[in-house]
């Protein structure tokens, strides 16, 4: 971590810290000294001390995401939203006082919010300095089911979901895997849509980050079904919607969502990405 942070500092780069009190369906993972507490028993003091120590050590951190894929955790436990809001507020106040230039917020999966109709959870957790969103143009089975134009329209829903607070785009992507209906042409077109969205809404955006620069070898991107808790199923004897089916597609999606392939060849979207960066610098 120190080497990476030193590299970022030498190149005058700022860093977003993803702390993950909540990480999708689960709490944590936490360091051993925290153990495995329930949401209501997480110590505010311990979290404040841990985050304070990190922010003092790495002064290039300018944003902190306390929870990620937050809508998934509260999907079946909305009664715990007030508990989390109290925890967040209790941590936010002292840290903001000591580190006034650091922004604190939570992240949501925009495609999860849209696919599962969970916008009300985002609205109830409108806390902190910003609300961040990740985005894959996929259905609940992790197959691409949007055109770049439709995906661009999905991004516009962020402005309606969070009208009065800064927004962040955290880990946005488009896979080129044919296995999940991806193509290089559509990835390139989506890069254009992302920059159109950025330029139109720049005053309201805290940050925008692409999910992955480089592809990874197939099968190395997510947990295996055996290590995944719970079961995703549509019922009956069909394998459609099973853990294995969904995770297989997520593997293919993530491993091929980079802008440069595993052989080091630049995809057309990489050239478009660099062109758009240059256009933004010159505008």
Report residues per predicted region.
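Substrate-binding cleft and catalytic face of glycoside hydrolase catalytic domains
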Residues: 2-80, 87-103, 109-111
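Acidic (Asp/Glu)-rich catalytic clusters
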Residues: 2-16, 53-59, 120-127, 157-163, ...
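Aromatic- and acid-rich polysaccharide-binding/catalytic face
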Residues: 17-19, 59-62, 66-68, 106-110, ...
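Active-site clefts of carbohydrate-active enzymes
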Residues: 23-29, 133-139, 158-194, 210-231, ...
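The substrate-binding groove and active-site-proximal loops of carbohydrate-active enzymes
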Residues: 32-44, 69-82, 136-148, 181-185, ...
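Short, acidic/polar
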Residues: 43-55, 113-124, 188-197
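Conserved, mostly hydrophobic/aromatic
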Residues: 64, 91, 131, 171, ...
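Aromatic-rich peripheral "rim/lid" segments of glycoside hydrolase catalytic domains that contact
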Residues: 179-180, 185, 200, 204-205, ...
């Amino acid at each position: 971590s120190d080497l990476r942070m030193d590299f970022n500092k030498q190149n005058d780069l700022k860093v977003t810290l993803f702390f993950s009190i909540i990480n999708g369906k689960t709490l944590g993972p936490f360091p051993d000294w925290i153990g495995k507490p329930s949401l209501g028993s997480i110590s505010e003091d311990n979290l404040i001390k841990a985050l304070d120590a990190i922010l003092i050590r790495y002064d290039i951190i300018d944003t902190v995401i306390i929870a990620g894929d937050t809508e998934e955790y509260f999907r079946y436990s909305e009664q715990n939203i007030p508990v989390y809001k109290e925890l967040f507020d209790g941590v936010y106040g002292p840290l903001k006082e000591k580190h006034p230039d650091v922004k604190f917020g939570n992240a949501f999966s925009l495609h999860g919010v849209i696919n599962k109709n969970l916008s009300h959870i985002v609205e109830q957790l409108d806390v902190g300095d910003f609300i961040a969103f990740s985005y894959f143009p996929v259905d609940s089975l992790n197959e691409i089911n949007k055109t770049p134009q439709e995906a661009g329209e999905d991004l516009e829903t962020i402005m309606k979901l969070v009208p009065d607070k800064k927004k962040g785009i955290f880990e946005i992507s488009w896979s080129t895997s044919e296995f999940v209906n991806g193509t290089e042409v559509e990835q390139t077109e989506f890069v254009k849509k992302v920059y159109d969205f950025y330029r139109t809404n720049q005053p309201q955006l805290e940050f925008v980050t692409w999910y992955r620069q480089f592809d990874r070898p197939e099968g190395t991107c997510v947990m295996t079904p055996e290590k995944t808790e719970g079961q995703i199923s549509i019922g009956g004897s069909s394998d459609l919607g099973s853990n294995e089916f969904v995770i297989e597609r997520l593997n293919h999606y993530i491993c091929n969502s980079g802008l440069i392939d595993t052989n080091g060849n630049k995809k057309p979207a990489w050239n478009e990405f660099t062109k758009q960066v240059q256009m933004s610098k010159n505008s």
